[in-house]
Amino acid sequence: GDVYKRQVQETKMQPGQADFAPEGYTEYTYSAEKKGYSGTACWCKTAPLSVATGIGIEEHDHEGRVLTLEYPEFYLVNCYTPNSQDGLKRLDYRMTWEDAFRAYLLELDAKKPVILCGDLNVAHQEIDIKNARTNRMSAGFTDQERAKMTELLAAGFTDSFRAIHPDEVKYSWWSYRFHAREKNAGWRIDYFIVSNRIADKIKAAEIHNEVFGSDHCPVELDIDL
């Protein structure tokens, strides 16, 4: 079907910086206060009822990480989860963020179903990463980060790709180092996650690893609401 909404994370842009405007789409952006860092954006064919930036907590709302578009039947949440960084310097902050963000999603979910899209900076299971054994202490595959994803799903959400493709090995991100993409030494860290009560409406969930142009590739959800 038609692509009605395109979400992008880590835009690194300030308002008005985009030099492209897809015809028939309206742009919504949320930039970090620090220039050239983080940021989220969404291009939509259908205008939302409302647009919200951040999660309403001062500590977490300086980096342009969460953009929420409300539609009659659902909330669309575009998220760029903080990276725990080399040496896990930001892991403690990441844990605080995870709990606050999950609470925010549950608040929305109490009103209407949620579709969460984004770079969630975690490979949830061993199937989601090429080199599981050597990355146990790497940002994005620590036990702590993986446990937070488990907690999110247990709170009433479904990982759309894994629901449709329980055993498929496919990645959405490859380091620019070590010829990782050529070797397909990747991670699946980009997701569409939906409220359990609309999971049966998923028609397709795909990872387009044939698309180049970034260290990430696009992920797609086709859902009939």
Task: Indicate residue ranges for each PLM-predicted region.
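Metal-dependent phosphoesterases centered on the DNase I-like endonuclease/exonuclease/phosphatase
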Residues: T26, W97-A185, I189
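Conserved beta strand-loop-helix elements of the APE1-like EEP
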Residues: K35-V51, E168, H179-D200
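Surface polyanion/phosphate-binding segment centered on an Asp-His-Pro turn
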Residues: E206-L225
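Active-site metal-binding loops of divalent metal-dependent hydrolases
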Residues: T11, L120, C217
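Acidic carboxylate-rich catalytic motifs and surrounding loops in phosphoryl-/glycosyl-chemistry enzymes
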Residues: I55-G56, D159-E168, A205-N209
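Short, small-residue-biased leader/transition segments that mark boundaries at the very start
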Residues: G1-Y4
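Structured beta-strand-rich core segments of catalytic domains in phosphoester-bond hydrolases
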Residues: K12, Q17-S84
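Surface-exposed cleft-lining segments at the edges of enzyme active sites
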Residues: G56-I57, T81-E98, R133-M137
